[in-house]
């Protein structure tokens, strides 16, 4: 079996629920249902709190004296500290405990979201900007803990259906991204700056008692593998580049798209939230489909990764569109491109986690929560690298050369990662064919040597 295959052989020996028989994948146990409910509530709540900033925060920050580059850094610092948190929490997941990390992360994220709602009371200038950075950093640490624990728990509970489950739960991430901007824009227009943050922060905090009651605990011994061994695997390194490029594309839009749409099409804050809807909704709808296909037909994962990246690159060329194409910027075209981008993002993002997991198992990593913690932490860390670079680079480039060219440059990331993965898979297939031919030839020679000599 090649390294692109599913991690099912390793998972069937595991002790988590769902790892024993094929029947379990068809009929969920009560424990698996509780895991799904917990992960879904976390995805929905945390992604809503993350995404509400898009429609109105850049404008508020401008009023407080923040430049486009500074706004991009406020968005981007979240990802930088989520990166650090994911690496640390992934390494020490077994020692801390997945359930405690999950609950504590949600508590921190919900609490600081409420604090973000009172920042408008601060004076404009350095004090406001510094507090924005501080609150976002603490929020990132909480979210990093929750998402690392969630991914590990899911992979442990559903070892044979990782992509399907994660793809299905992306519906709730997508719903959070879908509901966050329009809800945030509506609450901002109706009640002002404070209410969106206080409302959504309270929702996240109210989910904690539910998760305390229903989320199961998973215990495991600490593994001996390291992040360094994992990330130095060539295939893991390339998939990490794919994750970074896709995440940076999402992050690029946070500080730039709302300002571009407001200035270009003179839309209100509420309508800007609906523009974000095209990307989030199409991603939420398409992700379960690509997750199911990735588990049922693992050989399709490589094509999803490659073509998803290439389509995403084309979308960013048309987002402005790039002036070289001489296409007039129109609102319907922008929304259409965002919808296609949501589908292509689902196509390329969903297979990355099971691909990393199967590669780790194929290279000698043990089947257990410690390996799941390493892979989850690495996935979260690489996503955070892109989410850190995207807003900062996007804010800087938009300030210097405009949104149209900035979006096109952003698209080059996914073009490069798509081409790199295509070349790797071609090399991998060629190597496997040569190895198989050599094995067949060696077997035939051994059989010939064992046959009696007829002469």
Swiss-Prot record:
**Residues that bear Phosphoserine:** 20
So where does this one cross the membrane? 33-53, 70-90, 100-120, 127-147, 167-187, 195-215, 233-253, 272-292, 304-324, 331-351, 377-397, 407-427
For this record, the Gene Ontology CC terms, alphabetical, are: secretory granule membrane; synaptic vesicle membrane
Question: Recorded GO terms, molecular function?
Answer: monoamine:proton antiporter activity; polyamine:proton antiporter activity; transmembrane transporter activity
The organism named in the record is Rattus norvegicus
What compartments host this protein? Cytoplasmic vesicle, Secretory vesicle membrane; Cytoplasmic vesicle, Secretory vesicle, Synaptic vesicle membrane
The molecule here is called MFS-type transporter SLC18B1
Gene3D superfamilies recorded for this chain? MFS general substrate transporter like domains
State the taxonomy lineage.
Eukaryota, Metazoa, Chordata, Craniata, Vertebrata
Which positions carry N-acetylmethionine? Answer: 1
Q: What does this protein do?
A: Proton-coupled polyamine antiporter involved in the translocation of polyamines from cytosol into secretory vesicles prior to their release via exocytosis. Uses the electrochemical proton gradient generated by a V-type proton-pumping ATPase to couple the efflux of protons with the uptake of a polyamine molecule. Facilitates vesicular storage of spermine and spermidine in astrocytes with an impact on glutamatergic neuronal transmission and memory formation.
Q: Which gene encodes it?
A: Slc18b1
């Amino acid at each position: 079996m090649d390294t692109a295959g599913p991690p099912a052989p390793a998972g069937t020996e595991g002790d988590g629920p769902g790892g024993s028989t094929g029947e379990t994948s068809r009929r969920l146990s009560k424990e698996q249902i509780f895991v799904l409910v917990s992960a879904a509530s976390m995805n929905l709540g945390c992604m809503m709190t993350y995404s509400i900033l898009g429609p109105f925060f850049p404008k508020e920050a401008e009023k407080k004296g923040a430049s486009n580059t500074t706004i991009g850094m406020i968005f981007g610092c979240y990802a930088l500290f989520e990166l650090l948190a994911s690496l640390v929490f992934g390494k020490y997941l077994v020692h801390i405990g997945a359930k405690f990390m999950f609950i504590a992360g949600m508590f921190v994220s919900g609490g600081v979201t409420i604090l973000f709602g009172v920042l408008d009371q601060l004076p404009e200038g350095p004090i406001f900007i510094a507090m924005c950075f501080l609150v976002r950093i603490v929020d990132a640490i909480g979210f990093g803990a929750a998402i690392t624990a969630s991914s590990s728990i899911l992979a442990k509970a559903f070892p044979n259906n990782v992509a399907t489950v994660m793809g299905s739960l992306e519906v709730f991430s997508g719903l959070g991204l879908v509901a966050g901007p329009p809800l945030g824009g509506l609450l901002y227009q109706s009640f002002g700056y404070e209410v969106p943050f206080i409302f959504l922060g309270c929702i996240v905090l109210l989910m904690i008692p539910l998760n305390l009651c229903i989320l199961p605990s998973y215990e495991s011994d600490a593994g001996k593998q390291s992040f360094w061994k994992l990330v130095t695997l060539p295939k893991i390194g390339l998939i990490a580049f794919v994750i970074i490029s896709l995440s940076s594309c999402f992050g690029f839009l946070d500080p730039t798209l709302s300002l571009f749409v407001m200035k270009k099409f003179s839309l209100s804050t509420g309508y800007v939230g609906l523009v974000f809807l095209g990307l989030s909704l199409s991603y939420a709808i398409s992700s379960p489909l690509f997750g199911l296909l990735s588990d049922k037909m693992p050989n399709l994962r490589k094509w999803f990764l490659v073509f998803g990246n290439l389509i995403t690159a084309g979308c960013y060329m048309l987002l402005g569109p790039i002036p070289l194409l001489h296409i007039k910027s129109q609102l319907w075209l922008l929304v259409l491109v965002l919808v296609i981008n949501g589908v292509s993002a689902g196509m390329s993002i969903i297979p990355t986690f099971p691909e990393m997991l199967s590669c780790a198992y194929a290279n000698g990593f043990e089947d257990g929560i410690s390996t799941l913690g390493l892979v989850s932490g690495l996935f979260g860390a690489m996503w955070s690298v892109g989410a850190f670079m995207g807003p900062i680079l996007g804010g800087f480039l938009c300030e210097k050369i405009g949104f149209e060219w900035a979006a096109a440059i952003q698209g080059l990331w996914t073009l490069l990662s798509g081409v790199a993965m295509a070349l790797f898979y071609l090399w991998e297939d060629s190597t496997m064919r040569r190895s198989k031919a050599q094995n067949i030839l060696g077997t035939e020679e051994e059989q010939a040597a064992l046959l009696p000599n007829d002469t």
